[in-house]
Amino acid sequence: MRLTKTLLISAVLLMSATGMQAAGFNQNGNYLTVQLKQHQNFGPSQIRLQVVSDKIIRVQATAEQSFRNKQSLIIVPQNSKANYKVEEQGDNLIITTAAMRAVMNEATGQITFYDLKDNVLLNEVAQGGKTFKPFTVPDREMGVDIAKVPEAQKHGWSWRALFNSPDNEAFYGLGQHQSEELNMKGKNEDLFQYNTKVSVPFVISNKNYGILWDSYSYCRWGNPEDYLQLNRAFKLYDKDGKEGQLTGTYVDKNGQKIVRGEDSIYFEYAMPEASEICNKTDNGGIQNLPKGFALNGSKVVYEGYVEAPTNSFYQFILYYAGYMKIYIDGKLVVPERWRTAWNPNSYKFETPIKKGVKTPIRIEWQPDGDVSYCGLRVAAPRSEAEKNQLSIWSEMSPDMDYYFIAGQNLDEVISGYRTLTGKASLYPKWTLGFWQSRERYQSSKDIEDNMKKFRDLHIPVDNIVQDWNYWKLDSWGSHEFEAARYPNPQAMLDSVHAMNGRFMISVWPKFYDTVKNYKELDSKGWMYHQAIKDDIHDWLGFRGSFYDAYSDGARKMFWRQMDENLYTKYKFGIDAWWMDASEPNVRDCTPMWYRKA
């Protein structure tokens, strides 16, 4: 009798076109929306499933009464018509395609994905699989243009998606990071764009599925909480055993010594000196290093003891420039590392620390620059079971929005990713050859001489790259070759092509505020102004900012300016564009909140 009833419900549902209301859900085309029967604290009120294809199901969840209208910046329009079956069994809504099943509990909202042999591919945790917290953008993060931000855009939701994961599962993806980690199972990673960091909200599993979440916010993989200062995670003791802080010893290149207490190691950023908002709201960073101490050529040691509140493998994050070594409990846990002072890096490591034991710690730092950076923080301890879950956190979004992509193998999963994000153009064959690039070539003569030398030496080069600063010193953003160094760009391009080479050029979304292109973009409201207000000058000594690449009109104007000055002007002789500085980065090594402003 139950089987007959289920088949009858399925048949009725399959006959539906749009707008059908069933007992627990509403169906409109390929969308099925469920108003949850049990609203949990911090949980969603509605969940919407979209069958994109046989192997792709989209999951949206909101804590609001309805879903907001939004246009994705990463998902291309999906016009495929997937065939699928919908049925209800008790509290469960079941969607079956030709490749998989998705089962959602209409009471709790928990979703489980299966293959057609009833093997679990992925399932959300039963309680807390989808959680929300209201989020309002702090005024200082909206910066000088706060008056232009509509009230509705100041408010959204922080959300976390949490899934069970078996011990033998591995995760790969998240973009390109300097973490020296491949399998991200049990690891933490902050997702944002930076000079040496490319973040992609997508992972694949060795269980042959992938998850792509549609969020452009600051995100965290793994631990959803920020790392703690050492004094928030441990009891600290100085090198003599006195409780409260570590001992910091600073010795400059002349042997002059400063010894002081350190309750945290957090010298990770610098503040723009003329920034009113920085001076009012942030007194941290490298300004808390000893006043008047010359870092370059110095040696710094932080030492003492930490006492942990519980036994755990503690996950640390080291932020460093210059030379760095760390010992914990007498063991070298971070062998010597180096990073150029103007562009620090993060390095993650974990080590066991016993509860209630004064464990020695020693941090050795050689700053190797007039300005340099150092920080050591630690994640609050979590159980191994918690670490091994698949956890995604997004700081601010209108809703939770992710795509589950199934496949028989990882190639099929990547194919699903390409279905969602659009097919990548196939590069011409010459791009598969060797590319030659320097920090920059400084003249057309450099370009032509180097290309000829490669040919004379029979070294196969297909592409030579012109990096930054081919413009006049004070004209960043002009997209114009400086005539004194590039007297005839057309002849340079023709020469490279005559040697059967190709030419690639770096173009930046950055403009000095004195150039014509800046003024044209600014007249339409398409330039960011915080760096201008704060009078930030780059390392060459000039003031500038970045344009608003989120505006369709701004992007069209940006391309027109490139086209007029570099492409059409030189008979389409430029073969490839290096769209540099996708961060954007108005100044190196500022705190996260200021980068947002």
Task: Indicate residue ranges for each PLM-predicted region.
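Aromatic- and carboxylate-enriched substrate-binding clefts and catalytic-loop regions
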Residues: 64, 347-349, 366-371, 460-597
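A low-complexity, Ser/Thr/Gly/Pro-enriched, surface-exposed linker/loop concept
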Residues: 25, 29, 48-93, 133
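Extended carbohydrate-recognition surfaces in non-catalytic/accessory domains of CAZymes
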Residues: 231-310, 399-426
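Boundary at the C-terminal end of the N-terminal hydrophobic targeting segment
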Residues: 20-24
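Catalytic and substrate-binding clefts that recognize carbohydrates or anionic sugar/phosphate headgroups
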Residues: 88-241, 255, 314-318, 323, ...
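Extracellular and analogous surface-interaction loops
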Residues: 51, 204, 293-296, 301-314, ...
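Bacterial N-terminal signal peptides that target proteins for export
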Residues: 1-8
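Solvent-exposed beta-strand/loop surfaces of large extracellular or lumenal domains
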Residues: 69-85, 288, 328-349, 529-534
